[in-house]
Structures are given as structure tokens and as C-alpha cells.
């Protein structure tokens, strides 16, 4: 049962992906005396990932280097709303989604009015890739390279790239793992 729930409600390529619906399955499996050790361990592992940066919780802070080599952190970004994008410039799907975001008129209007800021974080750590691609993003976006070890320290559940979060002014997660249609609403 857990494998089916995970396949349909957790995997990034599932059209039914919904971590909130997955939570009861994970909690039950993690606590079930009837489940074998593997199922309980798998449920615990996934539960830990799903509970990270859930809607309603404060997003984990991290440090990054900007295009102009300034050290910043997530919580210092002042914005009514912040679209946080974890991406890899060598990921074709990432660049397709970023291109869609750049072309979306509602997002552009909110960005230009100052209601929304976009922080795009390169998480992979390859300095030459970062230097070669950091200026491909629009100038009115904040582009950064992770220096906190987001992936290694599992600060965020980055099960697929790109991963998009929408945060409020207090850095509380409004939406997690959203698609472009959700941003425009």
C-alpha cells in the first residue's frame, strides 16, 4: 500500500502528486506494528522529507553567493511574496520552466510592481557551470549559488528539478513543489 501511495502521491512525475494526502499513509506505516522493518524505515525516511518546509511552516534558511559575489541568506530577502526556485542550468526541464516563468505576464506584472521577488538558487556547486550561466537569468531576479550545502544537508526535499516554493513576507511556505499555473493565481 505504501509503495502505491508513494508512486501516485509523492513522485514528481505523477499527475496526482500531493504530499498532504500522502502524510496519513506515511504516518500509519511508520507507526504500524504490522509493517515490516523495511516499510517502517521507508515511511520514516519519506515522512522526514515530506515534513520539510511544508506549507504553513517557515522555510529553512540558507546562504548563497549572488552574481556579484555577495554573501546573502534566504531570510534577508525582503519581499511580500518570494518565488524560490532551485535549479540547475544544465537541466533542460529547469530552463524550460524558467523560460515559462519569464514569459508569464501575471508573474512579470507582480515582479515589476515589487509584490513578488524571484530567487533562483543553483544547488549543484560546480563553479564553472555557475560562472558560465549566472547571467542567463533576468537582471530583476536574484540569482545565487548555494553555499550552505542544501543538497548534502537535505535542507529541502529536492526530489526533482526545478523545485519551486512560494513564500510569504515572513518566509512561511505558501506552496511547495508548485507548477507555473499555481504561481500565476
Language model segments and positions:
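Oxidative protein folding and maturation machinery
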Residues: 1-72
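Short active-site neighborhood of thiol/selenol oxidoreductases, capturing the structured segment around
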Residues: 70-102, 117-121
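Structural microenvironment flanking redox-active thiols in thiol-disulfide oxidoreductases
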Residues: 96-135, 148-153
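Short, internal strand/loop/helix patches
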Residues: 131-165, 169
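Extended hydrophobic-aromatic, low-complexity segments
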Residues: 74, 84, 92-97, 112, ...
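Thiol-/selenol-based redox modules, centered on thioredoxin-like
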Residues: 166-185
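Short loop/turn microsegments at loop-to-beta-strand junctions
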Residues: 59-60, 82, 161-163
Amino acid at each position: 500500500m505504501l509503495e502505491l501511495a508513494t508512486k501516485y502521491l509523492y513522485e514528481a512525475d505523477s499527475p496526482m502528486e500531493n504530499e498532504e494526502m500522502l502524510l496519513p499513509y506515511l504516518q500509519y506505516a511508520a507507526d504500524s506494528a504490522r509493517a515490516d522493518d523495511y516499510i517502517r524505515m521507508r515511511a520514516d525516511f519519506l515522512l522526514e522529507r515530506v515534513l520539510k518546509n511544508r506549507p504553513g511552516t517557515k522555510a529553512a534558511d540558507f546562504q548563497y553567493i549572488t552574481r556579484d559575489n555577495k554573501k546573502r541568506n534566504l531570510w534577508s530577502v525582503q519581499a511580500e511574496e518570494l518565488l524560490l526556485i532551485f535549479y540547475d542550468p544544465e537541466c533542460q526541464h529547469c530552463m524550460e520552466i524558467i523560460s515559462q516563468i519569464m514569459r508569464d505576464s501575471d508573474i512579470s506584472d507582480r515582479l515589476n510592481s515589487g509584490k513578488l521577488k524571484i530567487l533562483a538558487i543553483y544547488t549543484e556547486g560546480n563553479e564553472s557551470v555557475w560562472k558560465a550561466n549566472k547571467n542567463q537569468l533576468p537582471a530583476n531576479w536574484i540569482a545565487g549559488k548555494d553555499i550552505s550545502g542544501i543538497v548534502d544537508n537535505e535542507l529541502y526535499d529536492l526530489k526533482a528539478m526545478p523545485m519551486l516554493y512560494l513564500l510569504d513576507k515572513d518566509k512561511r511556505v505558501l506552496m511547495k513543489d508548485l507548477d507555473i499555473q499555481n504561481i500565476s493565481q
